[in-house]
């Protein structure tokens, strides 16, 4: 179920402050955040945001296709190495 239109998108206040400062200062450094729940807004386009995945900060370059999605969607938390091979079938 999606969020109500009348409420608007959710973005953490500290992230908005950092984005505004980066846009005003033309800063190209990645913005480090732990807020995976924040929605990508059109003001974020062209910025690199380092989203925490539980272990490290994954740099995510924001483009226009990402607007409306959550930041956590672009920083995967689980790594799949593949299932163990069956040793009997290899013979």
UniProtKB/Swiss-Prot annotation:
Checking InterPro entries in the record gives:
Ribosomal_uS19, Ribosomal_uS19_bac-type, Ribosomal_uS19_CS, Ribosomal_uS19_SF
Cited Gene3D superfamilies:
30s Ribosomal Protein S19, Chain A (3.30.860.10)
Question: Single GO molecular-function term?
Answer: rRNA binding
* One Pfam assignment: Ribosomal_S19
Listed GO cellular component terms?
A: cytoplasm; small ribosomal subunit
Q: Does the keyword Ribonucleoprotein apply?
A: yes
Gene Ontology biological process terms, A to Z:
ribosomal small subunit assembly; translation
Which terms are listed as keywords in the entry?
Ribonucleoprotein, Ribosomal protein, RNA-binding, rRNA-binding
Q: Which domain of life is it from?
A: Bacteria
**Similarity remark:** Belongs to the universal ribosomal protein uS19 family.
Q: What does this protein do?
A: Protein S19 forms a complex with S13 that binds strongly to the 16S ribosomal RNA.
This chain's protein is named: Small ribosomal subunit protein uS19
């Amino acid at each position: 179920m999606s969020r109500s239109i009348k409420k608007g998108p959710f973005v953490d206040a500290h992230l908005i402050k950092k984005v505004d400062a980066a846009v005003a200062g033309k800063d190209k450094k990645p913005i480090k955040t732990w807020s995976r729940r924040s929605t990508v807004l059109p003001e974020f386009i062209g910025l690199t945001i380092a989203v925490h995945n539980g272990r490290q900060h994954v740099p995510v370059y924001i483009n226009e296709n990402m607007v409306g999605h959550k930041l956590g969607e672009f920083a995967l938390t689980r790594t799949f190495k593949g299932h163990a091979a069956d040793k009997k079938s290899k013979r």
